[in-house]
Amino acid sequence: MGKCSISQANLGETGFSYTLSLINGKYKMTILYTLMEFGVVRFNEMKKYIGEISYKTLSVTLKELESDQLVHREEYPQIPPKVEYSLTERGKSLIPILDMMCEWGEKHRLPSRRTQKKVDIWDNTE
């Protein structure tokens, strides 16, 4: 497994830093993961899948991902307008990273406060 060398370059010039600059943002990874899971997705479907994101934030974030060539936007000239989003080949190259992050999260997930409280309620070892 290769490592980014910090000793030879400023941290801002490493592959790690570059990758983070593309995927860092409150909803970028969620959007990429949604496209990975569902393939071609329309704007309102994406909003429904993510839920808490505003229409403006979704629009801006999709434009950024499109500008970075991670997401493809296909617009169909019809009424009403139809726009679909999908991962580009470049975006698809992030799938192994997204999968690894998902696996890591499942393996190392800490119990939530709600779950912890439920466990504590039933703990009679006092």
Predicted regions and their residues:
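Basic amphipathic alpha-helical segments that dock to polyanions
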Residues: 58, 62-65
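C-terminal regulatory/oligomerization modules of transcriptional regulators
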Residues: 1-13, 67, 72, 89-126
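N-terminal helix-turn-helix DNA-binding core of bacterial DNA-binding proteins
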Residues: 10, 14-57, 84
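Conserved short-loop catalytic and cofactor-binding motifs
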Residues: 7, 34, 75
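Beta-hairpin "wing" of winged helix-turn-helix
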Residues: 66-86
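Generic recognition of well-ordered alpha-helical segments
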Residues: 18, 48, 60, 96-99, ...
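Glycine-/small-residue-rich active-site loops that bind phosphorylated ligands and cofactors
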Residues: 38, 79, 93
